[in-house]
Amino acid sequence: MATTNDLKNGMVLNLDGELWAVVEFQHVKPGKGGAFVRTTLKNVLSGKVVDKTFNAGTKVETATVDKRTMQYLYADGEDFVFMDLETFDQINVLGDTVGEAANYLLPEAEATVATHEGVPLYVELPTSVVLEITYTEPGLQGDRSTGGSKPATVETGATVQVPLFITTGEKIKVDTRDGRYLGRA
């Protein structure tokens, strides 16, 4: 148990039997009336985002989330198989749980897998990964005064917008949070 005064970004709460991660919080002390805490919460399993307001000092139940560094091994149908780097145990994580991270997962890549009571909740990747471009059209600058971009398919099958000078076979750095091109690797 914790109070709303102890909230931090990333903390996982157990509200009404569901797990919610604190995305953002703000302590508000109006000139008139009692203080309160305004939060933005994200459902860990469904991804639904809600705004919730608590009175200051209200007790909330925190959930114990175990974060472990694991290595991605392979895809098994809809599941993704990860191996714990300390115990070498393998766990299957549902594709829905992996979510957008699947676009940047390569075999043997390390990721952080968060679990609650042995159930995988979500997968966190490093903020950037290096991927090889498997296909992109040749870029023709033409008579444009500004630089343009073009779609490129990377080795995981995801599509990334890259500058016109990038060619097939090059390795690029991609931001895993939003899929942006960061530069050549």
Swiss-Prot record:
Involved in peptide bond synthesis. Stimulates efficient translation and peptide-bond synthesis on native or reconstituted 70S ribosomes in vitro. Probably functions indirectly by altering the affinity of the ribosome for aminoacyl-tRNA, thus increasing their reactivity as acceptors for peptidyl transferase. CDD domains: S1_EF-P_repeat_1, S1_EF-P_repeat_2. The keyword Protein biosynthesis applies. GO terms for molecular function: translation elongation factor activity. Pathway: Protein biosynthesis; polypeptide chain elongation. Belongs to the elongation factor P family. This is Elongation factor P. GO terms for cellular component: cytoplasm. Its main location: cytoplasm. InterPro entries: Elong-fact-P_C, NA-bd_OB-fold, Rib_uL2_dom2, Transl_elong_fac_P/YeiP, Transl_elong_KOW-like, Transl_elong_P/YeiP_cen, Transl_elong_P/YeiP_CS, Transl_elongation_fac_P. GO terms for biological process: peptide biosynthetic process. SUPFAM superfamilies: Nucleic acid-binding proteins (SSF50249), Translation proteins SH3-like domain (SSF50104). It comes from Salinispora tropica (strain ATCC BAA-916 / DSM 44818 / JCM 13857 / NBRC 105044 / CNB-440). It comes from the Bacteria. It is found in: Cytoplasm. Keywords: Cytoplasm, Elongation factor, Protein biosynthesis. PANTHER family: ELONGATION FACTOR P, ELONGATION FACTOR P (EF-P) FAMILY PROTEIN.
